[in-house]
Amino acid sequence: MPQPDDLEKIADLTLEHYNQHAEDFWEGTRDHDVSQNIAAMLRYIEGERRFTILDFGCGPGRDLKAFTELGHIAIGLEGAARFAAMARAHSGCEVWQQDFLKLDLPENHFDGVFANATLFHVPSQELPRVLLELHACLKPGGVLFSSNPRGHNEEGWNHGLFGVYHDLETWRRYVSAAGFVKLTHYYRPAGLPRENQPWLASVWRRLKEPLGCRDPQLLTSR
């Protein structure tokens, strides 16, 4: 299990990688079509259709701009300084520069949290706490969307980035324990055989209180 110094290193090196490769990342992802993911989250948010959305790990701001163009109030959260600056410039939205492991979020504030290709960077021992913080920042009944590269619960470094590659059952256990109920899940890209769909997307609704245990050792027990 990583110690506090190791967690600091994990965050610092991952953010440094993104800062060093910010322009290449933007060029490689700016035209990605994630409209399926955006629609999947918005479909389940209840209430007047001008929602307050937290784009958790907003990167250079592609999806912030998309939410704004759909008429929603979008706020970005990004740990990498270069991404945060790019997101502000590209989207015109407010962007909070925060490390995922050192969050400072308002309570009961957002209708939806859009975590597209981001939560897999959170070490498994810290994931229960981070999910509880996302639960708390949502309004009651609010919606969490996540999409992560899937695997068999491997955890470690891959091309300069730290990641955890959960399978569906493990991911369900973590998110359910943090006080969410699953609404739907699917694999991406659409229309391909399952073995060619590396992304697991899922949509969750916030319950009033977390139901599960906060001990990550018990969360991962079979």
Predicted regions located by residue number:
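Conserved class I S-adenosyl-L-methionine
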Residues: P2-G59
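Class I SAM-dependent methyltransferase SAM/SAH-binding core
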Residues: P60-K102
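A short glycine-rich, Lys/Arg-flanked "PGG" loop and its adjoining helix->strand segment in the class I
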Residues: P128-P140
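Conserved beta-strand signature within the Rossmann-like core of class I S-adenosyl-L-methionine
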Residues: G141-N148
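Acceptor-substrate binding/catalytic loop of class I
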Residues: E154-T170
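Core SAM-dependent methyltransferase catalytic element
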Residues: A190-S221
